[in-house]
Amino acid sequence: MAGINDREKALENKFAHDQELKFKSMARRNKLLGHWAAGLLGKDKDAYATEVVVADFEEAGDEDVFRKLRTDFDAAGVTVADHDIRTKMVDLLAEAAAQIEKQS
């Protein structure tokens, strides 16, 4: 019985660890995305990155972040295709995950 409990505890710990890595990776991705977008928008990188990170708490998934960028690009007259924004989001998530793994 102890073996089953140990395995269950190990699975719970792995799940918690994986969720923490996912959260950290998404937050890092949003920061990197904010820096990228700020460069295109002519805004302060750190301040805008914070806005992007905060925008991600509006709803689950990436749509809130995408909408923030799309709205801000449109308002500033910056031409970036939806596909390019989504591709950058995917690319920066991979980069962020690699950075987080490297730090762990």
Question: What are these model-predicted stretches?
Answer:
Residues 1-104:
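A charge-rich, low-complexity, intrinsically flexible signal that marks solvent-exposed coils, linkers
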